[in-house]
């Protein structure tokens, strides 16, 4: 039983498969209001959305790999995983009433932890309480504050948020990623987009945001056997990569005549970029979001990071690819979170949930993540609303 000084939290002390390394601590130290900085908030976590990128890090690195106290003082490494969540505000920092009056105690919010707290201090979201910066939080406003009804027809409860806490838990980092990468592509109506990994949680959000930019045509998706699901969120065409191997040869054969105006890879398949010249238009951008193909070891992760850094720098005369390349990681902020929520409120964006697991079953949730067969977000219910 947790108290105000302790809480339930999943922790890990070594690298490896999360389903094998995490341990449930029923008396983990709880953050408190006394620890809050001026722009921070204490949140009671209801749901946590798992992230494949964090799973890759957990498999490759021990917790807090860059924490100097642990290096020099040889303190025990201990980390709480994950960073995307939804919940209820318990307490606010001293600056919040004047800078963010929309964030008050008892307000329902979605957001993510600061990178420093997660990756350096080991204080992630898979716990009953967490501290998060105001810049990476946004309230779930009731429908009555964001929409109006012009007719007498029955509609949604105006006192209800436009999205549930459960669905909202996966919208902060992934939603910001979808909006920000579409901004990077500079796509306009009539352009042609290719998304690899359309059945990933971020892939399905990208498809929906792209639909608002490109209109009825233009989004081509590579996925497995999930064509119905992918089309339901707005894809115009779905390529079954399991039946078209190698995928880059299929793209060269069928799309060289009208190349793509942007390619977004949610998986991290290097060959898609190294062979993309015929099917990605000159001057257009290849964006990689994924690390699912990285070897799950320290050196494998180091090699992946090195390759991401070198890909755009390698000269064409030495075998480089004459197309722009960028590895992108979400930068959640208030402005982008606001854009995400406006899309949700207009019914133009929804989170596809693969499965929901109770807090005690987080190991099973990680097994689902490790299978790489999830179709949408994997959610852990930390505590009841």
UniProtKB/Swiss-Prot annotation:
CDD domains linked: MDR1
InterPro entries found in the cross-reference section: GroES-like_sf (IPR011032), NAD(P)-bd_dom_sf (IPR036291), PKS_ER (IPR020843), YIM1/Zinc_Alcohol_DH_Fams (IPR050700)
Binding site for NADP(+): 64-67, 199-202, 223-226, 241, 289-290, 372-373
Residues involved in substrate binding: 156-163, 309-313
Gene3D superfamilies in the record: Medium-chain alcohol dehydrogenases, catalytic domain, NAD(P)-binding Rossmann-like Domain
EC number: 1.-.-.-
GO molecular function annotation: nucleotide binding; oxidoreductase activity
UniProt xrefs under Pfam families: ADH_zinc_N_2 (PF13602)
SMART domains: PKS_ER (SM00829)
Keyword NADP attributed: yes
Metabolic or biological pathway: Secondary metabolite biosynthesis
Conditions for induction: Expression is positively regulated by the oxaleimides biosynthesis cluster-specific transcription factor poxB.
Record GO cellular component, one term: mitochondrion
Free-text function comment from the UniProt entry: Trans-enoyl reductase; part of the gene cluster that mediates the biosynthesis of oxaleimides, cytotoxic compounds containing an unusual disubstituted succinimide moiety. The first step of the pathway is provided by the HR-PKS poxF that serves in a new mode of collaborative biosynthesis with the PKS-NRPS poxE, by providing the olefin containing amino acid substrate via the synthesis of an ACP-bound dec-4-enoate.
Quaternary structure annotation from Swiss-Prot or TrEMBL: Monomer.
Similarity annotation: Belongs to the zinc-containing alcohol dehydrogenase family.
Annotated protein name in UniProt: Trans-enoyl reductase poxH
Organism encoding this protein: Penicillium oxalicum (strain 114-2 / CGMCC 5302) (Penicillium decumbens)
Lineage of producing organism: Eukaryota, Fungi, Dikarya, Ascomycota, Pezizomycotina
């Amino acid at each position: 039983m947790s108290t105000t000084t302790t809480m339930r939290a999943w922790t890990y002390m070594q690298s490896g498969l999360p389903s094998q390394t995490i341990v449930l601590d029923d008396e983990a130290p709880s953050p408190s209001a006394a620890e809050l900085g001026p722009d921070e908030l204490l949140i009671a976590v209801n749901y946590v959305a798992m992230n494949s990128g964090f799973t890759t890090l957990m498999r490759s690195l021990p917790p807090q790999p860059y924490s100097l106290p642990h290096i020099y003082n040889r303190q025990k490494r201990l980390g709480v995983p994950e960073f995307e969540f939804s919940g209820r505000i318990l307490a606010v920092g001293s600056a919040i009433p004047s800078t963010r009056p929309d964030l008050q105690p008892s307000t329902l919010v979605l957001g993510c932890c600061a990178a420093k707290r997660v990756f350096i201090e080991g204080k992630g979201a898979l716990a009953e309480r967490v501290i998060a910066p105001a810049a990476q939080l946004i309230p779930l406003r009731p429908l009555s504050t964001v929409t109006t009804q012009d007719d007498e027809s029955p509609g949604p409860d105006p006192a209800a948020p436009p999205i549930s806490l459960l669905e909202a838990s996966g919208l902060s980092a992934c939603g910001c990623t979808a909006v920000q990468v579409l901004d990077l592509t500079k796509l306009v109506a009539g352009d042609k987009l290719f998304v690899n990994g359309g059945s990933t949680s971020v892939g399905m959000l990208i498809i929906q945001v792209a639909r608002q930019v490109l209109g009825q045509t233009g989004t081509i998706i590579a996925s497995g056997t999930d064509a119905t699901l992918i089309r339901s969120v707005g894809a115009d065409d779905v390529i079954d990569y399991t039946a078209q191997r190698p995928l880059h040869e299929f793209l060269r054969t069928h799309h060289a005549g009208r190349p793509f105006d942007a390619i977004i890879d949610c998986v991290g398949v290097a060959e898609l970029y190294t062979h993309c010249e015929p099917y990605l238009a000159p001057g257009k951008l290849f964006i990689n979001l994924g690390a699912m193909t990285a070897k799950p070891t320290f050196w494998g992760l180091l090699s992946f990071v090195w390759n991401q850094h070198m890909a755009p720098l390698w000269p064409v005369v030495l075998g480089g690819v004459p197309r722009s390349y960028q590895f992108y990681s979400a930068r959640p902020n208030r402005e982008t979170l606001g854009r995400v929520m406006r899309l949700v409120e207009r019914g133009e964006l929804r989170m596809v949930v693969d499965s929901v697991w109770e807090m005690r079953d987080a190991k099973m949730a990680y097994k689902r993540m490790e299978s790489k067969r999830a179709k949408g977000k994997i959610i852990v219910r930390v505590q009841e609303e």
